[in-house]
């Protein structure tokens, strides 16, 4: 009830927000309104050349879909009095832009074509929120100066627990682009399914991409699998290398880098089912049909394991030009290693103290291989256990304290703590009362309402001397309880907007203002057919 009242107060006070606010999420760094208006229509020309033609084309198609008219793209404005001119200026930062709306036209200047794209996303939101008269839109004159606080602004999608189509993955990328994210973390391998074609190892998709059935409802690691209900329906599929290239190209056109995750040495049961010799026991294994953590992991004592990992990564590197490769490293039980003679021999041979250091040995070998190929690793914060190199980037999920620990050790950090950034968590404290679908976070015990996401401070009171190590923020969507993409959207939105403002507008946030602007953004969700949770809009948290 207390939170409900807080939400009502926040909504009621929206009218008091400064008149300088504009309907843009994430909140711009500065807005200066001036007198006058300009009207744009299907006769307006977007002036773009060279590398700016691509963002101009995407912008024009979006405006056509959302507003019913498509601006003309040309290399000059001609006699147009409502031209939208795009330009770059290397004096600005790579993601910094200036949006200048005057009576005589609109100019977007960015430090790069990517920055211009962000300026166009802001203009897109302004156009949709402005008064329309047929195919004519009237905009207030203003100057917006804007740039992001964090260089890494990401969204993760798990396509393993449940798989989604190419078009649905592209829609997720569109959602990220609307919110000015620049990274798509693509979780591609799991105990419950292997989702990427690796030609050297065809069984990964022939066997590992399909599970025979799926547990119904909530299930935990310690549950007796024989007493759980299952749906009896096979579930699976994978992305061909051609499809992966298509998705990477689509994201790149929207200035989003795709970072693949090949999780290791745990979360590999689908690979073990495909190639049983990779496990300590040698099988038999089957693709996991329930959630939770499996004790079966890659054998760290066999050289064939590392040959397999390197073979997989060789093909992954051909498909993804990203600077980083995510290698997981989370939730790797050590039970099988403790009982494995080969793993114990590896510990003795390498002078390791225990199985935690064996995992570090595993991660170091993979990191060194990727370094030899000119790439760097990201791993979940468990890779800190047993020691890790300073060149590894840590994705802190088990609380912000893990990120602080990594920063103090000298590692770069992406903050994605579950208590703020796990968008599979329930959105209300009483999911049964509010008819929420099955969700993560212990079925509401750790719910994550919009206001909590928005309150996240990635620096978490860390000493300012470590601020430079905190490189960004990411929202994660684990799909155990999301059998279709509409459900994914429902869990992502509108909380993705809060993540966007945390990562872009840090130090410039205002929740009352955000509430006002979110109501405008909601209409863009509606226009694009995005499914979203309405709890916030109904005053429920």
What are these regions (language model features)?
Residues 1-23:
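Bacterial Sec-dependent N-terminal signal peptides
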Residues 20-150, 487, 503-537:
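Contiguous, structured surface segment used for ligand recognition
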Residues 50-57, 113-117, 163-167, 238-242, ...:
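Soluble non-cytosolic domains of exported or imported proteins
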Residues 54-55, 163-165, 191-197, 265-271, ...:
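Flexible loop/turn segments at secondary-structure boundaries
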Residues 92-296, 300-306, 311-324, 365, ...:
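Feature activates predominantly on carbohydrate-active enzymes
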Residues 271-277, 281, 286-393, 397-410:
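Active-site neighborhood of glycoside hydrolase catalytic domains
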Residues 376-382, 387-392, 398-541:
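Flexible, acidic glycine-rich loops studded with aromatic residues
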């Amino acid at each position: 009830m207390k939170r409900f009242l807080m939400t009502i107060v926040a909504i009621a006070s929206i009218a008091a927000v400064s008149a300088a606010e504009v309907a843009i999420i994430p909140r711009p760094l500065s807005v200066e309104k001036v007198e006058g208006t300009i009207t744009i229509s299907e006769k307006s020309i977007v002036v773009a050349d060279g590398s700016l033609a691509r963002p101009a084309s995407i912008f024009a198609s979006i405006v056509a879909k959302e507003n019913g008219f498509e601006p003309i793209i040309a290399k000059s404005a001609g006699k147009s009095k409502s031209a939208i001119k795009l330009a770059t200026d290397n004096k600005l930062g790579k993601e910094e832009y200036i949006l200048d709306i005057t009576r005589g036209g609109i100019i977007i200047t960015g430090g790069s074509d990517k920055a211009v794209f962000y300026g166009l996303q802001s203009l897109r939101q302004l156009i949709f929120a402005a008064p329309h008269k047929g195919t004519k839109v009237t905009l207030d004159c203003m100057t917006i100066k804007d740039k992001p606080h964090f260089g890494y602004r990401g969204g993760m999608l798990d396509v393993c627990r449940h798989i989604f189509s190419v078009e649905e993955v592209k829609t997720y990328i569109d959602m990220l682009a609307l919110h000015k994210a620049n990274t798509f973390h693509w979780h591609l391998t799991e105990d419950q399914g292997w989702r990427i074609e690796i030609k050297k190892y065809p069984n990964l998709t022939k066997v590992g991409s399909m599970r025979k059935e799926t547990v119904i409802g909530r299930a935990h690691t310690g549950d007796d699998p024989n007493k759980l209900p299952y749906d009896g329906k096979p579930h699976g599929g994978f992305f061909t290398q051609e499809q992966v290239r298509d998705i990477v190209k689509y994201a790149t056109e929207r200035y989003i880098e795709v970072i693949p995750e090949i999780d290791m040495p745990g979360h590999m049961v689908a690979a073990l089912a495909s190639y049983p010799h990779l496990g300590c026991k040698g099988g038999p294994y089957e693709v996991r049909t329930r959630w939770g953590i499996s004790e079966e992991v890659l054998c760290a004592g066999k050289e064939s394991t590392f040959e397999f990992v390197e073979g997989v990564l060789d093909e992954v590197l051909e498909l993804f030009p990203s600077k980083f490769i995510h290698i997981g490293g989370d939730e790797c039980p050590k039970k099988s290693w403790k009982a494995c003679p080969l793993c114990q021999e590896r510990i003795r041979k390498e002078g390791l103290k225990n199985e935690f250091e064996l995992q570090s040995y595993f991660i170091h070998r993979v990191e060194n291989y990727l370094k030899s190929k000119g790439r760097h690793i990201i791993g979940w914060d468990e890779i800190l256990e047993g020691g890790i190199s300073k060149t590894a980037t840590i994705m802190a999920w088990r609380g912000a304290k893990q990120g602080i620990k990594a920063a103090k050790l000298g590692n770069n950090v992406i903050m994605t703590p579950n208590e703020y950034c796990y968008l599979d968590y329930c959105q209300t404290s009483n999911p049964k009362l509010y008819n929420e679908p099955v969700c993560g976070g212990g079925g509401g015990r750790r719910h994550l309402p919009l206001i909590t996401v928005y309150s996240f401070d990635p620096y978490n009171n860390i000493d300012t001397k470590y601020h430079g190590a905190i490189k960004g923020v990411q929202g994660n969507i684990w799909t155990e309880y999301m059998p279709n993409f509409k459900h994914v959207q429902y869990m992502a939105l509108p909380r993705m907007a809060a993540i966007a403002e945390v990562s872009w507008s840090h130090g410039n946030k205002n929740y009352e203002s955000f509430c006002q602007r979110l109501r405008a953004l909601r209409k863009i969700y509606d226009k694009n057919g995005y499914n979203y949770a309405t709890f916030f809009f109904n005053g429920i948290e």
